[in-house]
Amino acid sequence: MHIRLLLIFSYIYYCVRIKTNPARYFQLNAPFFNPSKGIFSKLDIDRLIPQRWRLRQSADNGLVKDFQFPVFVKPEWGQNAYGIRRADSEQELNDIRHQTADSIMPRIIQEAATEAREFEVFYILSAADETKSAVLTVNEALNITKTDFPINSINNSNTFYRELTASLNEEQLSAIWAHMRAFGRFGISRVGLRSDSIDALVNGDFHVIEINLFVPMPINLLDPDKTLKQRVSAILNTTWHLAQITRHIPKDQVAQSVFFKKWWVARKVKMLPQTP
């Protein structure tokens, strides 16, 4: 909670300092917002992912039958793993369908990535040079249960995160950034993916689990080994560059009512059944 508050207030402070409207934050990724659905649709965003990195997924319309289990049943939009369920068999999938039959949020089914490790790459685009990142952190999601195919998130008490950025050299970070740029021009994003190793990730051998475009949390701030001083420094660096890229939003970009539509949808998603 304290991290979130410091993120919010320092961002507002920097926006005021450079004379930009902090509410413009919600327009950073507005070109990728689906106004008719009122969400950043996972299906829309999935189409932006190059085929080599894309997991098989589809709307849960009952027409696709030959899934490789396990699969994850997800709301078409959600944050921090809200509403995600795992099915290890056809029977479990049908049980989940029955339990969520009354949900007004459409579901998608995504096959599991089989790579050994899970990573989260958080970045903010550079306002000075959009071919570069102003902030780029590489983090590993770990689960104390050691189970296969866990649903990791900041709300899962069994999940914790380690930042790996400092252990990577410039060449490795540049390669990872090149992969991230292939998805599209996102002002801010957090990409969840699975890969067998850092070397495999650098070489482009991975599958994308999810791309978060709506208030993505800088996961590196949750590394339990970070000192208070390191956290505060990272927060201020993040929000300073976030304010800069907010000011850099093109003036002719069509504004979308992202915040209010997403707030309403978020309330509905949080009412969905959660994985125990």
Predicted regions and their residues:
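Alpha-helix N-cap recognition
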Residues: 60-62, 88-92
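ATP-grasp fold ATP-binding core
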Residues: 67-87, 105-116, 192
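Phosphate-binding site of ATP-dependent enzymes
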Residues: 90-170, 174-175, 179, 194-207
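Conserved N-proximal alpha/beta basic substrate-recognition cap immediately N-terminal to
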Residues: 1-68, 79
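Active-site ExK catalytic segment of metal-dependent nucleases
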Residues: 74, 139, 210-214
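Short secondary-structure junctions
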Residues: 51-54, 67-69, 104-105, 182-187
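C-terminal active-site "lid" helix and adjoining low-complexity regulatory extension at the edge
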Residues: 5, 9, 18, 198-276
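Short helix/loop capping segments that flank catalytic or ligand/cofactor-binding pockets
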Residues: 81-83, 96, 219
